[in-house]
Amino acid sequence: MKKILLLMTMVLLLTAEGFSQAPGILNYQGVARNSVGNVLVNQNISLRLTIRNLTAAGAVVYQESRAVTTNPFGLFNVQLGSPGASGVTGTIPGVNWAVGAKFIQVEIDPNGGSSFINIGTAQLASVPYSLFATTAGDLILPFNKT
């Protein structure tokens, strides 16, 4: 009985370790509008999302394109780094979040093609930087009790 209990405990702990890993994706949500500001309702659109290093015009550290469908309010949701993207450059876990500011550039083709229009670039804030915390376990610190 003790062996079965020990085995079940080990399996549970190993399973918990697997779930504690960062997923390597970023959520992004927006409302799609046409050139005069009208919401694109229930429409197939294409997005190109780019993460840039240091400045809004900085080096590309990640890029992907996606075909998405807006909802009745023009809202769309994507997960950068998840399956289903095309034209992918880099990986989300491969971005060096520890060095410098990161910016996300959003481009859209309201017709669902590949004629992208740049609709803006914004600096990323705290949450994506938490991906850097996944490497904190790699630190080796001397512990001297003196």
Locations of regions flagged by a protein language model:
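Family-positioned intrinsically disordered, low-complexity linker/tail segments enriched in G/S/T/P
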Residues: K3-K145
